[in-house]
Amino acid sequence: MADIDNKRRALVTGGSGDLGGAICRRLAAAGAQVIVHANGNLARAQAVAAEIAAAGGSAQAVAFDVADGEATAAALDGLLADGPIQIVVNNAGVHDDAPMAGMDAARWRRVIDVSLHGFFHVTQPLLLPMARTRWGRIVSVSSVAAVLGNRGQTNYAAAKAALHGASKSLAREMASRGISVNVVAPGVIEGRMAGDAFPPELIRQTVPAARAGRPEEVAALVAFLCSDDAGYINGQVIGINGGMG
């Protein structure tokens, strides 16, 4: 396991979910001071933070809507009062699937507001404080749908694919400040979001590895990208999908 300096603070959006919780636990085990974010359910974020603390790690819980720029700015102002946040994992995201022919504008906007606008609302205010430390790691969690496309997910694929371009551009802007910006694009991962949509037979048909990935496998990759060992990996989209492409 790659170590992370125990003075570094890490914000994980969507940290109260299955994948986000695994990322929080892995970063804490590596040494980071973890800020576990929930979009609305603070109790779930507090439960993850308590689990980390019980294991000897450092964690706190916060809740704010990443789609709401003003609420996010206010929350981040409070967090930055305690010092810069040098690790950001943009993991918050939602599904609201429908064929585009039957998709209304609200459904389109909801997904993009969380995944894409949330990326901006969270990341932008943290950049200058991070740059002043001359070290930072920004990792956004995308999806194989952004690479391959997926029926019924034009909104989700569009939002996640936009993260690829934004991250590659931001990597060029921030690399000279010691900040890396990368994207992890998982395939089918065990958890509440995938359970109903991907029954075992469908997984065997669509995933060459014939199984769903585990949240801990994605978390291990994210934690590596947040470590000193990964400093020269920058502007990359890294798939973790059991061979889907």
Question: Which residue ranges define each predicted feature?
Answer:
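Conserved glycine-rich cofactor-binding loop
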Residues: 16-17
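The beta1-alpha1 cofactor-binding region of Rossmann-like NAD(H)/NADP(H)-dependent oxidoreductases
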Residues: 42, 63-74, 105, 216-217
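Substrate-binding pocket helix/loop in short-chain dehydrogenase/reductase
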Residues: 99-100, 107-112, 203
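C-terminal substrate-recognition "lid" of short-chain dehydrogenase/reductases
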Residues: 120, 127, 135, 214-240
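Active-site helix of classical SDR
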Residues: 123, 159, 167
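Residue(s) in the substrate-gating loop at a strand-loop-helix junction
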Residues: 143
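Short, small/polar-rich loop/turn modules that mediate ligand/substrate recognition or access, typified
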Residues: 175, 180, 233-235
